Amino acid sequence: MYIDSIIIAIEKRLGFLIRGKYWLWKIAFISVFLFVVIDFTGNMSKVVYFRSFINDYIKQGKLDTAHSIIKAQSEDYFEFFKQGNQTGITSNQHEAKMRFRLFLPTLVKILGAKHFEIWLYFLTFILGFFYIHVIAKIAFNILGETTNRILVLFFVAGFTNLYAGGGSFVLDIVPYGDFFAFLFLLLSIYTRNPLLIFVYCQCAFWVDERALVNAILVMIWWIFMPFNGNKVTVKLNTQWLAVFISGVIYMGIRQYLTIRYQLHDDTYMGEFITTFKENVKMLSLRVWAGFDGMWILIVMALTILFKEKNYQFLMAFLGSLITSVGFAFIAYDVNRGISYGFIALLLSLVICKKYLSEKELKYILIVCFLVSILSPTLNKFRLVGGGQLM
């Protein structure tokens, strides 16, 4: 077929680029490069976005709201809690939403607050390449050593084009800090050491509470992950338990701080309901914006599980996805929330690898990548004032 010949020709050229010992790193760099080129040429307003970063932060040393709150938290966590209670900060204020997001303030406290708005961005950017490299390595482990390396490239390139990929560290000047939660969630499925899994999950939870909800996907990974060959089987283990215990401890500490500093706010539920109703008005677009074309891989995986009558895995996987998406809808930045469930993409790759041929999987990954870079979702637009519209 004509399409096959085109794909083979492309494979040969791409294969030349990812030869050698450090080919996984090459895939990481190529994927990030493609993301930057595609994202910036598709929306030149992001050039203005980075120009403001240089003028406001680097040259003038200005701090926006998020930076100011992080700095205040880093100076004294508990004083920040007390001030929040005394000044009557309500749930719709940004300060209230960042009360328990203590990872970035801790990082700033350890490494120093001087020019932190600059070094924090560059630290995130550098670690981003390591993050994509780990994604590539896990994808390679899933696909197997005999698999064509091009499949790894297609998957990683498609993933990097998402907010959960390159967007979280290339564009995060604000800073949201989501990248660190993504990194820790990824490391919690990369290592098999229960203690490290516990620590990584704790770090992710204190970056953003959305990581707690999506830790369900990490537990599903450890319960269903095929350790022996390509078998997808249920396996309860210490890794799963480490994730669960970490979540319980986080909730316990958070509840203690809420009671201790009288931070309970009855307005939260009303705000959540109002936000949910507003987001539902753009249901399809907001859901799609979470994973763009990579949703195709997830839908394919769910279809395969249903066809193979693997209802146990299907219900666990689908239930966790619905929970993740539902929780994302109680905040206005929906696709940020959905992005926290990116482990679903790796789970989907596991399923598709087991039941599809290499050629079929290759075509699916190519389509996922192409649709992701061509679809005009919320990731592609900008709000007045420089904030990401998500």
Named regions from a protein language model:
Residues 102, 117, 151-183, 206:
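Aromatic- and kink-enriched transmembrane "portal" helix at the membrane-lumen/periplasm boundary
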Residues 232-313, 317-320:
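Membrane-lumen/periplasm interface segments of specific transmembrane helices
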Residues 290-291, 298-354:
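Membrane-water interface signatures at transmembrane helix termini and the short loops
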Residues 171, 175-199, 344-348:
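Specific aromatic-rich, kink-prone transmembrane helix
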Residues 2-5, 214-245:
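Perimembrane helix-loop-helix junctions
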Residues 185-187, 195-210, 214-221, 245-248, ...:
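Membrane-interface alpha helices of multi-pass inner-membrane proteins
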Residues 75-115:
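Short hydrophobic/aromatic helix or loop-helix immediately within or flanking a transmembrane segment
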Residues 122-144:
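Transmembrane-helix motifs of polytopic, lipid-linked glycan transferases
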